[in-house]
């Protein structure tokens, strides 16, 4: 990616972030006259820039995923701390997001440390504009993913804990457990030397080709369900959060990239073709009989 493309990407990313922050700030609680949602959106990007500088100077990507996770945790705690509505629902949302972020962030951080580098960044980290754009994209990812929860925490609407919150939490818990189990199964599979250059077909991976992504999509829908009763007015716009996660993981990165890579790597492999024909691409379900 050249400098012009990177700069355009950064501009578009920031424009989308500003739009989301502005719309959701229209019905947000304020602190000293500043919308809580908009303030937290600003801090999200400030965190990215603070860590981007030493990362670029040292030409390292080791703190990229970790920074994303820490941003989720920091903003969740900050928003609850600043909100005048200290409710059980807000605390629950912050805990749900923090638990997910701690688990995923540590998993990705140690995976990169073990592998030595993240090959996505080999060239990117040497190009200022491209690397900077990527950190901005991460900021937008955090904002859009966190949007529904942040909108609920920023909402002036007061609601009582009810069955909708319980249902949403159970959806989140189910998705979280699926993601954790799937990641652990694949990590153990890859750790065995005899599985080098092989694809996993056991455990949850026998029912879905991407169970970890299904789990992540499901848990963010759970977060949105918990957040839903607290929303009003323009804050409903933040319900794009789980939709964004779904599109991102199935159309932009995640599933689409890994499917293309797998078809290229195991092209002509009859066992892989059989696995594709038998196994659901995303939603776990019993393998087809062929």
What are these regions (language model features)?
Residues 49-60, 106-113:
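C-terminal ends of transmembrane helices
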Residues 14-24, 28-31, 44, 72-104, ...:
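Hydrophobic transmembrane alpha-helices
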Residues 31-46, 61-73:
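Loop-to-helix transition at the N-terminal end of transmembrane alpha-helices
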Residues 1-14:
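N-terminal membrane topogenic signal
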Residues 109-120, 185, 254-259:
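Juxtamembrane/interfacial segments flanking transmembrane helices
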Residues 3-6, 34-39, 56-64, 206-211:
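Short, amphipathic, aromatic/basic-enriched membrane-interface segments that mark the entry/exit
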Residues 58-74, 117-134, 198-205:
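Juxtamembrane helix-capping/reentrant segments at transmembrane boundaries
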């Amino acid at each position: 990616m050249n400098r012009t493309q990177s700069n355009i990407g950064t501009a578009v990313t920031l424009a989308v972030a500003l739009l989301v922050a502005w719309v959701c700030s229209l019905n947000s609680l304020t602190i000293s006259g500043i919308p809580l949602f908009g303030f937290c959106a600003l801090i999200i990007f400030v965190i990215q820039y603070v860590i981007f500088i030493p990362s670029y100077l040292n030409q390292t990507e080791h703190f990229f995923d970790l920074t994303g996770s820490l941003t989720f945790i920091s903003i969740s705690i900050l928003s609850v701390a600043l909100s005048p509505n200290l409710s059980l629902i807000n605390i629950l949302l912050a805990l749900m997001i923090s638990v997910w972020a701690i688990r995923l962030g540590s998993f990705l951080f140690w995976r990169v440390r073990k592998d030595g580098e993240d090959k996505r960044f080999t060239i990117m980290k040497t190009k200022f504009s491209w690397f900077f754009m990527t950190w901005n994209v991460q900021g937008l990812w955090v904002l859009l993913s966190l949007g529904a929860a942040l909108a609920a925490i920023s909402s002036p609407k007061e609601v009582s804990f009810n069955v909708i919150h319980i249902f949403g939490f159970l959806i989140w818990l189910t998705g979280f457990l699926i993601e954790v189990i799937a990641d652990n199964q694949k990590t153990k599979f890859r750790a065995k030397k005899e599985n080098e250059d092989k694809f996993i077909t056991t455990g949850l991976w026998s029912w879905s080709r991407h169970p970890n992504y299904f789990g992540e999509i499901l848990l963010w829908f759970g977060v949105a369900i918990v957040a839903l009763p607290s929303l009003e007015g323009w804050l409903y716009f933040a319900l794009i959060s789980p939709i964004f996660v779904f599109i991102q993981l199935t159309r932009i990165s995640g599933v689409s990239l890994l499917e293309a890579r797998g078809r290229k790597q195991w092209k002509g492999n009859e066992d892989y073709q059989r696995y594709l024909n038998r196994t659901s691409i995303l939603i776990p379900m019993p393998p087809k009989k062929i």
